[in-house]
């Protein structure tokens, strides 16, 4: 199906482009979302008449998105989840969780704006892209931790798993020293 794009669509084209897409994509996504019109003579004439108005509206929404991106860029949000000692989450952090964390931080972010390649399944700091407009995106950091204390440690740049491994190594060293002392005391007694 041939459609006229009413706004920039990622991996498809710019506003005003006439592109060929699959019928289902056009009927189920582009047309209902108001992102495109069927490419027929009447719609092409209608688009040409409204083109200046659509470009002005697009420019206005882009400026609003750029202002929001400037505020949102580099922000850090904490998400508390239960996890194993190895740092694997017992669930995952999804775009919905990231959007809720940003909303709790005072920003208006919808889950559809959060771009995750895959759900987050480990403790730590994770960079997440927020697409505020087809041409504007911001990067936020999601700090996934078991508690607020662990979140503060991770924010300082330390890894919870690394600290736990160091504590285990120190404990094993102390146990080895105790056994050495006990062994030395036993050989002194003989």
Curated annotation (Swiss-Prot):
HAMAP family named in the record: Ribosomal_bL9
Biological process annotations from GO: translation
Which NCBIfam families would you find in this protein's record?
L9
What name has this protein been given in UniProt? Large ribosomal subunit protein bL9
GO MF terms, alphabetically ordered: rRNA binding; structural constituent of ribosome
- Superkingdom, taxonomy of origin: Bacteria
Function comment: Binds to the 23S rRNA.
Pfam families, sorted: Ribosomal_L9_C, Ribosomal_L9_N
- Keyword rRNA-binding present in the record's keywords: the answer is yes
GO CC annotations, alphabetized: ribonucleoprotein complex; ribosome
What keywords are assigned to this protein? Ribonucleoprotein, Ribosomal protein, RNA-binding, rRNA-binding
Q: Does the UniProt entry include the keyword RNA-binding?
A: yes
Q: Which organism is it from?
A: Rhodobacter capsulatus (strain ATCC BAA-309 / NBRC 16581 / SB1003)
Which InterPro entries does the entry mention?
Ribosomal_bL9 (IPR000244), Ribosomal_bL9/RNase_H1_N (IPR009027), Ribosomal_bL9_bac/chp (IPR020594), Ribosomal_bL9_C (IPR020069), Ribosomal_bL9_C_sf (IPR036791), Ribosomal_bL9_N (IPR020070), Ribosomal_bL9_N_sf (IPR036935)
Q: Which family does it belong to?
A: Belongs to the bacterial ribosomal protein bL9 family.
């Amino acid at each position: 199906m041939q459609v006229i794009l009413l706004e920039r669509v990622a991996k498809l084209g710019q506003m005003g482009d006439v592109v060929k897409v699959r019928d289902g994509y056009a009927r189920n996504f582009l047309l209902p979302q108001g992102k495109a019109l069927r490419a027929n003579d009447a719609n092409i004439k209608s688009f040409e008449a409204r083109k200046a108005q659509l470009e002005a509206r697009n420019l206005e929404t882009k400026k609003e998105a750029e202002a929001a991106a400037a505020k949102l860029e580099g922000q850090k949000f904490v998400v508390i989840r239960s996890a194993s000692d190895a740092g694997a989450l017992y669930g995952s952090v999804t775009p919905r969780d990231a959007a809720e964390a940003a909303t709790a931080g005072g920003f208006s972010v919808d889950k559809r704006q959060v771009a995750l390649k895959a759900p987050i399944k480990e403790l730590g700091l994770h960079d997440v892209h927020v697409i505020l407009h087809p041409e504007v995106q911001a990067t936020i950091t999601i700090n996934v931790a078991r508690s607020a204390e662990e979140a503060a440690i991770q924010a300082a740049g330390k890894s919870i798993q690394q600290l736990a491994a160091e504590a285990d190594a120190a404990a094993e060293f102390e146990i080895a020293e105790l056994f050495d002392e006990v062994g030395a005391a036993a050989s002194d007694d003989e």
